[in-house]
């Protein structure tokens, strides 16, 4: 008989004292409450820097499963760059230094591309400010800014405040000038609408497009015509004599400071790929030997990468496989990628001895119409696997508290919590009957806050702590744990040595 060690992830099940708008607290959940009272338990931090996000930012399912499976804090791109700036590593980055060396030796210009806002989804203007300060420190004289206006991840008419903030840094450092301005609708298309990207390219390379004496004038004129940040036409900033402040020329260098790839790929390809055929670039196609992308955008972009992908070696799944143990990953459609791809550190392939079970999520418009989703089918399939003694390690996700929680509707979400509790009982009972151990936790909160203080639906995730219960009475748990500490604790229970790459600390004392 196998004694399974199961990790049960109650997606979106956070803990909060206040019962108002709290579907987790208001639901009848005798199984969870019983385990909480009977077995060793604690809470874990599932948001902010504890999961590699900026301080105070709510967690999400992708990040949660990545951290849990990796057994360490997996820094997301925004935080990774922030930490590099804070710790002084940013200025030493080899790709930045190489681009700077190139323009200084050749007497050419450094161009900074990117989304100018503090939205933090595709970019952060603080990263561009760090580049301006670096250029000033290294004595680069010609630095030009090609600002992509946001209006989508931030308010629709906020560009002026970001231009003002940039001008402050230009004043402070003595380097940098705006060269072109364009709305992200043009510069950051991802749907192969190449006519939009072409307008942007022609402004940057040929100085073609509406001309303005300043970035401020460009924005004011656009607003006067009812065109707001996202949709500002690619425009050229000109000197007093109406010549462009700068265009992109041979041997110039570019640093593209967006860190999220999807909307950066197309415009990057126009500049980096010699075989580019999506539109005719015209006679002037500048040769850019140093085109630096903040992160790895795509195999289709021939540029240098400042922050290379982090290889997550020795995730929980890999370590379990190396120990010769059999593992099962099981979830319904909505969370299947999370218990497989994300849990395995961004790996699609199965490990040796890994089995996967996918149960289809119900075909309904929104899950508040069917709060139980496919939880009973998932549970039946899993209990059957446990009874057949097939696996040493089980990774299970129950999707309901998150997927129904996104509706912001109390009644359906309470039903989702209650269905989750019912099935949690069945699974834990089956595990205990085999003398196994269950670790019950969540990846982030959601169902714990369904209403705002005004009584409006709250559809987002929360920053509340998540539970951690071990159904074994002879263990002691420490306080202050994070999601990255779960895998080390599981390895402790399995009697498998924790690899050095796994920097989380076991929650089991």
Curated annotation (Swiss-Prot):
The keyword Metal-binding applies. Substrate binds at residues 122, 152-153, 184, 190, 260-263, 335. Gene3D superfamilies: Alkaline Phosphatase, subunit A, BPG-independent phosphoglycerate mutase, domain B. The modification Phosphotyrosine is found at residue 35. It catalyses: (2R)-2-phosphoglycerate = (2R)-3-phosphoglycerate. InterPro entries: Alkaline_phosphatase_core_sf, BPG-indep_PGM_N, Metalloenzyme, PGAM_B_sf, Pgm_bpd_ind. It holds the Pfam family iPGM_N. GO terms for cellular component: cytosol. Its cofactor is Mn(2+). Mn(2+) 1 binds at residues 402, 406, 461. Binds 2 manganese ions per subunit. Its EC number is 5.4.2.12. Pathway: Carbohydrate degradation; glycolysis; pyruvate from D-glyceraldehyde 3-phosphate: step 3/5. GO terms for molecular function: manganese ion binding; phosphoglycerate mutase activity. Keywords: Glycolysis, Isomerase, Manganese, Metal-binding, Phosphoprotein, Sporulation. Mn(2+) 2 binds at residues 11, 61, 443-444. One of its GO terms (biological process) is glycolytic process. It is an enzyme of class 5 (isomerase). The active site is at 61 (phosphoserine intermediate). Essential for rapid growth and for sporulation. Catalyzes the interconversion of 2-phosphoglycerate and 3-phosphoglycerate. Belongs to the BPG-independent phosphoglycerate mutase family. Monomer. This is 2,3-bisphosphoglycerate-independent phosphoglycerate mutase. It comes from Bacillus cereus (strain ATCC 10987 / NRS 248). The lineage of its organism: Bacteria, Bacillati, Bacillota, Bacilli, Bacillales.
